[in-house]
């Protein structure tokens, strides 16, 4: 199995001004491509050969294979959750109902998710995930980790590695996080539920 780059459903400049073309060019075109290339060179001849990225993340111990598989999975989910002009500015349907049930309101959820994103020390990810019973969880994952490792299904992820925002927001992580809400494609996120 060869791991491949996800195809972006938008042009590299389509998310401006939230995410600049320069950031997409580096973040997607260079960082993610490097993780994909690394994974393709690390996996052959190992017990992970032929496994999906999700299966590798769920079972691999810490190390190069896990780190690169985690970042391929994380970035694929991340880049595919955006749209230049999303149809909705908050989730509806089953996801909207689950957010209200588990967080009280969409605004409460955003507050908690922003706090997790901004409060993560160092590099990593904030995730909204669902467990096998349908309950939603917000988690902070360090480095290349993903909620799949804990048996959760990731729905929405914010990348808070500095490479995700430094060209556009410098050290203002909170500004980056607050702007991302403007480009979330809630239809894509809900389909992951």
Curated annotation (Swiss-Prot):
Q: What is the lineage of its organism?
A: Bacteria, Pseudomonadati, Bacteroidota, Bacteroidia, Bacteroidales
What is this enzyme's EC?
1.15.1.1
Q: Does the entry annotate any disulfide bonds, and if so which pairs?
A: none
Q: What class of enzyme is it?
A: oxidoreductase
Instruction: List the keywords (alphabetical).
Output: Iron, Metal-binding, Oxidoreductase
Designated name of the protein: Superoxide dismutase [Fe]
GO CC aspect terms: cytoplasm
Oxidoreductase as UniProt keyword: yes
């Amino acid at each position: 199995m060869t791991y491949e780059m996800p195809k972006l459903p938008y042009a590299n400049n389509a998310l401006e001004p939230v995410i600049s073309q320069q950031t997409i060019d580096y973040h997607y075109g260079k960082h993610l491509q490097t993780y994909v290339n690394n994974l393709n060179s690390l996996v052959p001849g190992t017990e992970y050969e032929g496994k999906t990225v999700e299966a590798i993340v769920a079972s691999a111990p810490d190390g190069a294979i896990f780190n690169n598989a985690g970042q391929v999975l994380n970035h694929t989910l991340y880049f595919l959750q955006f749209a230049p002009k999303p149809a909705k500015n908050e989730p509806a349907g089953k996801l909207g109902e689950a957010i209200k049930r588990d967080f009280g309101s969409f605004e409460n959820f955003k507050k908690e998710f922003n706090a997790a994103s901004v409060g993560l020390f160092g590099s990593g990810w904030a995730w909204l995930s669902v467990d096998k019973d349908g309950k939603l969880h917000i988690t902070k994952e360090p480095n290349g980790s993903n909620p799949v490792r804990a048996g959760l299904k990731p729905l929405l992820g914010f990348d808070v590695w500095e490479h995700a925002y430094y060209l556009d927001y410098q050290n203002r992580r909170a500004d980056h996080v607050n702007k991302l809400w403007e480009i979330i494609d809630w239809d894509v996120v809900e389909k992951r539920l």
